[in-house]
Amino acid sequence: MSSPIPSSKPGQRAHLSNGGVDFLLEVIDGAPVIRYWAASFKGELSQNLFDRSIANSDFDEITSPGIMREHSRGHLGYPTIKGHRAGLDWSTKFSVKEFKSDKNSFQIQLEDSDAKLTLDISATLDQFGVLKVSQELTNLGDTYFLDELNYWMPLSDCATQSLDFVGRWSNERNPQRRDIAIGRYVRDSHEGRPGHNYTIGMIALEKETNFASGQSWALSLAWSGDSQYCIEKNYEGSASISAGEVLLPGEVILATGESYRAPDLYALYSNSGLDGLASNMHKHLRARSLHPKSARPMTLNLWEAIYFDHNEEKLKKIVDAAAESGFERVVLDDGWFGSRRSDLSGLGDWQVSKEVWPSGLGSIANYIRDKGMEFGLWFEGEMVNPDSELYRAHPDWILKVNNRIGPTWRHQLVLNLDNQDAYNYVLDSVDKILSQYQITYIKWDHNRVLVDAGSNNRAAVRKQTQGLYRLFAELKKRHKSLEIESCASGGARIDLGIIDLVDRFWTSDNNDALERARIQRWSAQFIPPELLGTHIGADPGHQTGRSLSFSFRALTALF
């Protein structure tokens, strides 16, 4: 038996149209329902397009492809929201309370008066066809424990495959494409950062879609902590795509009147292949007021040239060669501070080492500037070696649960940015070095994942991520011309959450041009090339031992 989905009330309908994309949303039985998300169309969509059959042994009313996927409305898949009040109010049924829309945006407030919750959802479709969506949950009752709040978007029946990325250190962004099968396919990160084996976004596409043609839909979450993407398909063939922050137990506990704002979501559509999808995202990001306006300086990072062997006279010879070759920026990497003669010690002691730089960094910084180049410096402010003056003085400043010390990674632990004293130490230490040496560029590394990431014994990945955002924002406030390069053992923290606070991503620690061609190509599926750090790799490559021609290595770095 075929049954129509009920029509919406007058005025409770949003038809967004911009950038060659149309997005149609209606309120059905009090719930916001996404009717259409694809290429722009003229006229009206036929009601027959939404008719669905009701099988025997099924609900007597149609379950609509709503934003709010709730069991109370007969949705049997994964829900939009999970939470409770000490086991109560675990089931919600939100209804639209306020609804506003224009050609390019909508704002909806939903309320569940029984559960005493409101949810504000807003979206804007820009001139490039990129839909930016936000969600904010407010608690109007007693203490509410939020476990999950996800974004969900329905997929066209044409979307029969998914594309995401996997990898490891020095081998990021390997594409994996698969058929969308019945069930729930999930990609999630539990590292306290996106990670090497994670995806910048999830893509659904037609089987025939290639770089130049075919339809594709994509989600990318603006968040640098734990997160997840998934595609779910039921037995009737209806599929949806989702993204959301992964919340650890107790990370979001809302008192009366408190709110949780989810990380923003970017939703993209293209009918001109994967390149069309990338082009739309690049145009959107380039239109930001924060996007770099000047040509990107040609940068020499000294890490693979010297590693921990800091010698001023040796470095000056390299600087001379860099100036003659047309470089515009020289970055001094790890090893300039404390007892940091290897990765075993000194991390966290952000004072210039008198052992290797007895007169400070002023001499080499001025030498570089006198050659007409900019001086940049490496930091890893979120981390600490157990063998360091900082850790010996403040062992309680790390992320931990009770007195349990987690496993080290590259011989280091993670400082707790939710601890105000630790946060102030990092901020003030970096600020002092930047001011003392007039530094306008830093490479900020992150070489350990977050495990047992507790603050006052409570899960703190969310607070740690927010602390990093606050730290970067404050550094840029104090140093107006500062540019930050985001690095995390290479490309393990490339995302749309941190992008407004940084000016470049280090794409991978692998500088082998053959490997880099793939890594850069797929990183550019979401991130514009001018924001992706590239180097002309050594010969032979330090990661692969492979010898490649200079022209190939140079062209790969340039393009």
Feature names for model-found ranges:
Residues K293-D428, Y441:
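Aromatic-lined carbohydrate-binding/catalytic grooves of carbohydrate-active enzymes
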Residues S2-R13, Y235-A255, S481:
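Short acidic, Pro/Gly- and aromatic-enriched capping/linker segments at domain boundaries
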